[in-house]
A protein has these predicted regions:
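A detector of single, family-specific signature residues
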Residues: 1-425
Length: 425
């Protein structure tokens, strides 16, 4: 009878490490050889040849690898699956916890991690539930593509925020009165268009009022600034900004203006791609019926799922995936609970912002705001606002899960009745 084999693979950018553990020799796991191979076609061929030499045929072998390094693990995952091997992605904390247990605070090495992953597979089968670990959803290509777009958009938005802050600082030195004209933002579309047409304070001061008005209203379409041209020209002529030695700052301003323009176009392009990617997903139409829900927010939530809602058996599993779950620590009389650190950070952020938006006084009346107030004013034990907001986000996730599983739009009246709240007409 062929022995069972467990293969652990530590993934790197250009080189992977592979360890093969035989079920009939489990005690040797700390000494088993580790085979390094390059992350390309010759390396994959060498790895498959190594598995064959070790006797690890597809029918008697389980493979696992960490879902780390962005997309670096996908090629080897696909190659092993194509050759008939059973492959799993495991979450990083499983390997981290076993490493801490076995090695303590020793330095991490690729060889040790490959052996640990193989050991985890063996313990899961030999011991059972005590060594169960969380698997990563292999996902759906549509949702994976959506996650890529959402991640790219987030990076572009962060880059724009940094460039915006830098341009604001430069303008505070060169033309501090600029913010008196553009009170909302000195890096908005109208302000950037003006700075592209008139890149220096002197250029604004020398321009005619008619030219400034044409740029602000005729070209930038900013009706808010219909009467701003005369004041803008006057401030440019009387500015308290730096007058001499402004060459480096002027160069920085021109570069930042162009950078912000390019980033705005990039974000707009990504928004169009997100709208097209979200449209065919069945859950998108359901989420869009919830209050305070924007297209970007819908895309972020679906990207955080990574798979159709049918892959989640309960709302608790969806909360875990979205990063909105509670971790409890209890020892004797000591009890501590906190929001878990796992899950998708983007969806956790969106859930928090959505819950905060729904409970505000200026928001339209909705069941979630009543739920929040009931928790804050609770009897006999009121909850602090921060904790109550967490409960609102959790309730919101549960309602979203039920609606998506049923394929029905959000119905506030039904939720009012379910929560036992009577709404006056």
């Amino acid at each position: 009878m062929a022995s069972q084999y467990y293969v652990g693979i530590d993934v790197g950018r250009r080189q992977h490490s592979l360890a093969v553990l035989a079920a009939d020799r489990p005690s040797t796991w700390t000494q088993i050889a580790v085979f390094p191979f390059s992350a390309d076609a010759p390396g994959f061929i060498a790895a498959l040849h190594y598995l064959a030499q070790a006797g690890a045929a597809p029918g008697v072998t389980r493979c696992a690898l960490e879902a780390t390094g962005g997309y670096y693990s996908r090629p080897i995952y696909a190659a092993l699956r194509a050759h008939g091997y059973a492959v799993q992605w495991i979450k990083n904390p499983a390997v981290h916890d076993l490493r801490e247990t076995v090695y303590g605070r020793r330095s991490k090495t690729d060889a040790e991690d490959a052996r640990l992953i193989a050991r985890l597979l063996y313990l899961q089968e030999a011991v059972g539930q005590e060594y169960a670990f969380h698997l990563v959803q292999s996902g759906d290509e549509r949702y994976q593509y959506l996650r890529l777009l959402v991640d790219l958009r987030w990076k572009q938005v962060q880059a724009r925020r940094r460039a915006s802050n830098q341009l604001t600082q430069v303008l505070d030195v060169l033309f501090p009165e600029f913010r008196l004209i553009f009170r909302k933002s000195v890096t908005g579309p109208t302000a950037l268009h003006l700075l592209r047409r008139f890149p220096t304070v002197d250029a604004i001061a020398d321009a005619s009022v008619e030219d400034l008005h044409q740029v602000l209203v005729g070209e930038a379409k900013s009706l808010r600034h219909q009467t701003a041209a005369p004041q803008l020209k006057q401030w440019a002529q009387e500015t308290a900004g730096l007058q001499g030695g402004t060459g480096p700052l002027q160069l920085a301003q021109e570069w930042l203006v162009q950078t912000l323009t390019d980033l705005d176009r990039s974000v707009a392009d990504l928004d169009q791609r997100l709208a097209a990617a979200v449209q065919p997903l069945p859950e998108a139409g359901v989420l869009a019926t919830f209050p305070a829900m924007s297209p970007t927010r819908v895309a972020t939530l679906l990207a955080g799922m990574g798979a159709p809602v049918t892959q989640f058996p309960t709302d608790r599993t969806l909360r875990k995936q979205w990063g909105w779950y509670v971790e409890v620590e209890q020892s004797g009389a000591r009890y501590r609970s906190r929001l878990g650190r796992g899950g998708n950070r983007g969806t956790r952020r969106e859930l928090y912002l959505l819950a905060m938006q729904l409970v505000q006084d200026r928001a339209a009346d909705n069941p979630f705001r009543h739920y929040y107030r009931r928790l804050v004013q609770g009897n006999p034990t009121p909850k602090v606002p921060k904790v109550a907001l967490g409960h609102v986000a959790s309730k919101l996730t549960s309602v979203m899960f039920v609606c998506m599983r049923r394929g029905t739009p959000y119905d506030p009246q039904q939720l009012w009745r379910h929560m036992g709240i009577t709404v006056s007409a």
